[in-house]
Amino acid sequence: MNILFLGIDLAKNVFQLCGLNQAGKSVYTKRTGRKELLQTLANIPACLIGIEASTGAFYWQRVFEKLGHKVKVISPQYVKPFVRGQKNDGNDAQAIAVALMQPTMQFVPPKSPEQQDIQTLHRARQRIVNHRTATVCQIRGLLLDRGIPIGSAVSRARRAIPLILEDAENGLSSRMRRTIAELYDLFNDLGRRIHFFDKEIETVFRQSEACQRIAKVKGIGPKTATAVVAAIGKGTEFKNGRHFAAWLGLVPRQHSSGDRQVLMNMTIKGDKHLRTLFIYGARAVVRVATNNNDGHMNQWVNQLKERRGFNKTTVAVANKNARIIWSMLRNDTGYQVV
């Protein structure tokens, strides 16, 4: 039994294994429970293991590596084309192993427990932000149904709702006022929770030398800096900065054939939250550069905006920032202003 590539279909209790040799032929299949999994892998000579990016993938990656194996995490969308036959654990494990063999396969960057801790902060914060947005939208809709409009911004809602509740002449019933008051209390509570996560992210930022280095890039703040470090670490999974920018989805979608090259909108692949942070920061850079033409960066931004418009310039700045940050993390260097 000469296993070089081992695909493992992860689950809660039952795991399916499929081993391939150098020629890609299946030479090993096994179905094992959670308690027996580690002993099973300990009896297999060191090989390259592939697992899908799912819940617990990074935990198992660290555990398998302690047994002497090399482990790669693959996005499910890259595994699906290699599935043959019906949907079952055996075919899924074999598809993972076949995908693992591909020389051009893109793998998910590994994450340490510390990186996962930081990512958890961002995920939890974003969930609460979405909940607060939904709460404000509900309050706005309920009031508009009674002929009382309020602005769309969160800050406007925070100022307007107390005044509406105190206005005895706006026609709201007592029951409606109590309902809006409860929703407004929920809105304020969510705001306090968001503030808690903001402070936690600031603490992580102050304690991380890498985060502080990349935050010197224009358009990069504590949230983006910590999110980048949590997502890619030192960026060793990427060949270059262009590869990282493409992984983020900050490159044009291509639809070309022969000599006809067609570039479309962004591919919007990869981490949506991280890409959003890059776009927000780049948008601020473009706005500031409008009133300040000093420096090479501002001149480039303004010239590009005249030719391509605000939105395309924003994406171009985000792409440039991503490539700069990858270089800084990969080579452990500081930001050099041109």
Question: Where are the language model's segments positioned?
Answer:
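Gly/Thr-rich phosphate-binding beta-strand-loop-beta motif of the actin/hexokinase/Hsp70
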Residues: 2-20, 96
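Conserved DEDDh/DEDDy metal-dependent 3′-5′ exonuclease domain
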Residues: 43-81
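Glycine-rich, often acidic, oxyanion-interacting loops/wings at catalytic, nucleic-acid
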Residues: 123-213
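Phosphate-backbone recognition surface of nucleic-acid-processing proteins
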Residues: 213-216, 222, 226-306, 310
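Low-complexity, acidic/Ser/Thr- and charged residue-rich accessory regions of DNA metabolism proteins
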Residues: 259, 298-338
